[in-house]
Every structure is written in C-alpha cells, then in structure tokens.
C-alpha cells in the first residue's frame, strides 16, 4: 500500500492543533500567547479561527473516526459563542447584548457542523450538529439575503456599510453551507429548498461579481445610494464559488427546473480556467517560472484548493481537470516544504515567505528567481510591543487549520486516483444510512 503523505500530514496537523490550542478544562480554544485571531487576556480565539478548525476536523471524519470525540469537544467550544437571540455564533463568546454576528463566519461554522453530521457514527451527536447547522442556515436565508439587491450581507447589523455590504465570502460560503446541509438531511423538501437557495447565491455571484476572466470580486458596497463593486480578488471567493457549483453538479435530482441551471457546467469550467491562469490576480506575480504560488494565506487558499479539487471530479472529462489537480498538489507540496514549523508540527499563514523571516525570504527568492525584500507581517508573530521584525514567529489556529484543509484536498486527489493510498481505502458510510460515499463533490 502506497502512503498518502498529504492525508497523514493533514491528520497530524488536526491532532497537533487540538493538543496545542484546546483547553480541556474549560472547553475553550485559545493560545498560550497573544497571536493573530485571539482576544482578551486569556488569548481566546475568535469564532472564525474555531470555525476553520471545525471544518478541518470534520474533513478528517471522512477518513477516520478517531477524531469524533475530539470534534465533540470542538462543538462544545463553539457553543460558547452561541447567541440564543440570533441562533448563530457571535464573533466572540456570547454575553447578553452581544450582537456581533457575521454571516460568513456562521456559514463556515455550518459547513463544519453539517459535514461532521454527515460523517459521524454517533446518531445523537449527528442530530445536535445538524440541528445547529439548520439554525444557522435558517438565519442566513431569512435575514441575510438582501431582498432588494440579492446577495448575502456581511453582518447581521443593518445600520449600513460595512455591515450591509453584499460580500462574495458571505454569499459563496452560505451556498456551500446550504449544500453541505442538504447532503446531511434526508427530507427531500428541505434538500430542494437548500439547493434552490444555493443556486440563487451562485447566480447572483455570476451576475454581479465576476471580472472579465471569471474571477470573483470581493463584493458590493453601498456608497451615496449606489452599489459599487469592490474589485479586490482573493483566492477564497473564487474557490468557494467553485465548490458550490461542483456540489450542485452532483445534486442533479434537485436542480432540475431551476432557472438557467443548464449554464452551470459553463460557469464552473470558465471559473476554473480563470483560477488556473498563473498570470492572473490569484497568483504571486513576483514568482518567475511555470509554477507560481497563490497570493494569499492558507485559510483563504484552502477554499481554492477545495474548489479546484471538487471541480476536477464534478467535471472529470474537462481538459482542465488534470491541471486543476496538479495545481492543488503543487501548492500542497510548497506548503509542506516551506510553511511547516517542524518543532510544533503546525503551520505559518503566508505563502509569501518574504513576510516571515529573512531566511525564508532568501528561500523564496531562490525558488522563484525573485527579488523580494523582507516584509515582516505582524499576524505571523506574537502580539507584543516592539518592532514587528523582532517579535517571535508563532503558529496560529487559523493558519494551521487552513493548511490542514489544503492537505485534505490534496489527499482526496491521491485517494481517488490511487485507491490503495491513505488511511482509509473505503470511505465511511454516512451515519444516516445513505450509500453516497462521494460527499466531497456530490
């Protein structure tokens, strides 16, 4: 049996994150020191970091059941953010009056919970996870969707920008969350409702946020009474939209009759083509040569890895399928070689190594025949006083969890293309009795 190095590493990262960042005495996720994503004197992580970790741990359940009990601990940690007013998670631990509730954060929480519910072998836990995911998606559909302009708002506050911005991240994440939930439910009427909503999200992105190369721009914001396009382009917006479209491709039973659904394959392939253009905005243009690293961090790029992977299996006959898989594997190889922190078994955040240290700047310049100068990033370092470049580098939960999710996408490619690889050659049957073992894309 050949070894799936990506799967082994992804599982190791998930385990190391739990050992490093989970406090079993309080069921909280935090850090021993102030780092990016933590808040207050106890260095507790904001819900975004915990959500990405929940997604990574849920991914692990596809391959092994050994993290099921640990996922239950993460679920308990997420409960500390839960608002009984909104039936969703606050950005930080809930207290009376806390109305800091982001739709994109909650969509990622729902993705993790729905995926875990799909794969867990414990029916009681499954019901708890899926119920919470349903509550979140209900809020998003009923309150997050802008009834006049379409799209999902960034935040539950309705007092104007930036809270009311119609963002690609909130809209695409919500689509994926709805589809992951649809896969975890048995009720065909609920499935149909969720699939229809997800398709509305995808159509809205297609009609409002694409650039000329089918890359997703960041969103719309209201300025002087007019909606203005923010043309910033990040890996996660395009990647998550591709994942949503790939999932829709596998749910044909529920997409029949949806307006313009016949355009879905073209939408998906066009976006994949843009995402693979190494001369485009998703790639670091300081790189020279045929391979360029993504111009982003791990917890954004993980969504592009997943999007390209799911596309390659949703449309396996596309001429872009194999290049998409190669890109996912190449980015994962770079990740493991340069961003891994050997001592902790965790990961830095930035693919731009020149933001980490002078030594890694030199490695980047050598690898890519580049000429970058060291640009220290405070988010890669312990949050303390003093010059940024003198602060110690440190791992973060969100950076490491994002790396794990990138590795799971690479692992899935190896497993499918070489079924003798990896920890599990037969994918686990969902606990609710369905025999669909291709939940990643269908």
Curated annotation (Swiss-Prot):
SUPFAM superfamilies recorded: Six-hairpin glycosidases
InterPro entries: 6-hairpin_glycosidase_sf, Glyco_hydro_76, MUG_Protein
Composition skew (Basic and acidic residues), residue ranges: 433-442
One Gene Ontology cellular component annotation held by this UniProt entry: cell surface
GO biological process, one term: carbohydrate metabolic process
One of the record's GO molecular function terms: mannan endo-1,6-alpha-mannosidase activity
Polar residues: compositionally biased ranges: 416-429
Listed transmembrane segments: none
Pfam families xref list: Glyco_hydro_76
Region annotation Disordered: where it falls in the sequence: 416-442
Keyword Nucleus (UniProt): yes
Secretion signal span: none
Keywords: Cytoplasm, Meiosis, Nucleus, Phosphoprotein
Subcellular location: Cytoplasm; Nucleus
Residues with PTM Phosphothreonine: 361
Function: Has a role in meiosis.
Protein name: Meiotically up-regulated gene 191 protein
Organism field: Schizosaccharomyces pombe (strain 972 / ATCC 24843) (Fission yeast)
Gene this chain is encoded by: mug191
């Amino acid at each position: 049996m050949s070894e799936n190095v990506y799967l082994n590493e992804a599982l190791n990262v998930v385990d190391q994150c739990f050992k490093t960042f989970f406090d079993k005495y309080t069921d909280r996720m935090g850090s021993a020191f102030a780092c990016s994503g933590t808040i207050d004197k106890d260095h507790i992580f904001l819900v975004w970091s915990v959500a990405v970790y929940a997604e990574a741990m849920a991914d692990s359940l596809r391959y092994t059941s050994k993290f099921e009990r640990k996922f239950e601990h993460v679920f308990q940690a997420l409960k500390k953010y839960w608002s009984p007013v909104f039936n969703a998670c606050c950005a930080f631990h809930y207290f009376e009056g806390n109305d800091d509730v982001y739709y994109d954060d909650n969509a990622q929480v729902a993705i993790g919970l729905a995926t875990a519910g799909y794969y867990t072998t414990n029916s009681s836990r499954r019901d708890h996870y899926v119920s919470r995911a349903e509550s979140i998606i209900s809020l998003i559909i009923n309150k997050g969707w802008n009834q006049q302009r379409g799209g999902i708002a960034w935040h539950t506050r309705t007092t104007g920008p930036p809270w009311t911005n119609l963002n690609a991240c909130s809209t695409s994440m919500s689509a994926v969350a709805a589809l992951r939930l649809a896969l975890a439910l048995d009720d065909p009427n609920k499935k149909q409702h969720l699939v229809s909503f997800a398709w509305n999200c995808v159509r809205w992105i297609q009609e409002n946020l694409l650039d000329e190369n089918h890359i997703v721009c960041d969103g719309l914001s209201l300025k002087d009474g007019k909606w203005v396009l923010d043309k910033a382009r990040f890996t996660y917006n395009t990647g998550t939209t591709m994942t949503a479209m790939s999932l829709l491709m596998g749910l044909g039973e529920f997409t029949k009759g949806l307006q313009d659904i016949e355009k879905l394959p073209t939408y998906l392939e066009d976006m994949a083509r843009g995402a693979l253009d190494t001369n485009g905005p998703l790639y670091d243009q300081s790189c020279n040569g045929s391979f360029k690293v993504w111009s982003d961090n791990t917890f954004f790029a993980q969504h592009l890895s997943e999007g390209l992977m799911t596309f390659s299996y949703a449309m396996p006959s596309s001429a872009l399928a194999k290049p998409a898989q190669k890109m996912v594997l190449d980015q994962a190889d770079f990740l493991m070689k340069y961003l891994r922190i050997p001592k902790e078994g965790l990961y830095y955040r930035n693919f731009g190594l020149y933001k980490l240290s002078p030594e890694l700047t030199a490695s980047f310049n050598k690898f890519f025949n580049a000429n970058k100068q060291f640009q220290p990033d405070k988010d890669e370092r312990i949050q303390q006083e003093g010059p940024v470049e003198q602060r110690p580098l440190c791992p973060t939960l969100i950076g490491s969890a994002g790396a794990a999710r990138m590795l799971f996408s690479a692992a899935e490619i190896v497993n499918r293309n070489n079924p003798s690889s990896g920890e599990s050659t037969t994918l686990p049957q969902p606990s609710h009795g369905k025999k669909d073992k291709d939940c990643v894309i269908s």
